[in-house]
Amino acid sequence: MKFTKMHGIGNDYVYVNCFKETVKDPSAVAKFVSDRHFGIGSDGLILLCKSNIADLKMRMFNKDGTEAQMCGNGIRCVAKLAYELGLIERETATIETLSGIKSLKLNITKGKVNNVEVDMGEPILIPEKIPIIKNESVRIEDKKIKAKFKINKKEFEFTCVSIGNPHAVTFVKDLSKIEINKYGPIFENLNIFPEKTNVEFVEIVDKDNIKMRVWERGTGETLACGTGACSSVVAGYLNNFTNRKVNVELLGGNLGVEWRSNNHIYMNLSLIHISEPTRHLRI
């Protein structure tokens, strides 16, 4: 199997061009390639596939083998790789995902993609569509879907958003003091989230800047998460903590996110890195 390993600000995946390769059991392959000791080492597996409704289709698998609806960092890398492999030949692209078709703009210099802007679509703020089960812990304030929990005498309040996949965003005073490996899996598996959830811990710097750490559903903590950054900006604006255009500082680097007046969220990264050359693997 021929593959390429790429990352967007540290959120790394193994990419396979399924226009030429066949992956019979992507769930099993995802588990293998994600292992940082006995595999290749990644946050998961992403397949570039043919589509009948877009330029191509992206399938994304977490490191535990589960298939996810969408990956913001991954889709930018897909666009870059697809262009440089000749699968698309324009500076715009449409990519089919389980959360719908996404539109992308590619900034190209000397045949290489150095910047990708993604239209992530509109945030989903309806409980049944996130999905989240309404109970005594969940309340709705205007457009905000709030959930409050006390764990080990520590209280957390979440704003819940979907960007094609579920996110629970909580705002904290000091991000460096958050025990993400302790609290991340607890919140990921709360029974109010029937499909589990991604979890973002966010520190407000000012109206234009936030810091974020993420616990990804099916993967654990990662260095970056594009849909998580978008969800955090939506939650920040709804709670009057931020403006609509925000710089999001993650462990792997910075992302620019803007929730525009047309209700669409746009995400921009100045450079996407290829961390390893194309390789061959026998599975």
What function would you assign to each model-found segment?
Residues 1-14, 18-20, 118, 142, ...:
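N-terminal, positively charged, Ser/Thr/Ala/Gly-biased leader segments
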Residues 38-57, 168, 183-215, 254-257:
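Conserved phosphate-donor
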Residues 141-148, 157-159, 170-191:
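Anionic-ligand binding region
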Residues 63-158, 223, 234-260, 266:
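Acidic, low-complexity central loop/insert segments
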Residues 4-52, 190-193:
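N-terminal beta-alpha supersecondary unit
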Residues 30, 50-66, 146-157, 205-220:
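Short, hydrophobic/aliphatic alpha-helical segments
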Residues 272-283:
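Single conserved hydrophobic/aromatic residue that forms the stacking wall/gate
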Residues 227-229:
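Helical hairpin unit composed of two closely spaced alpha helices linked by a short loop
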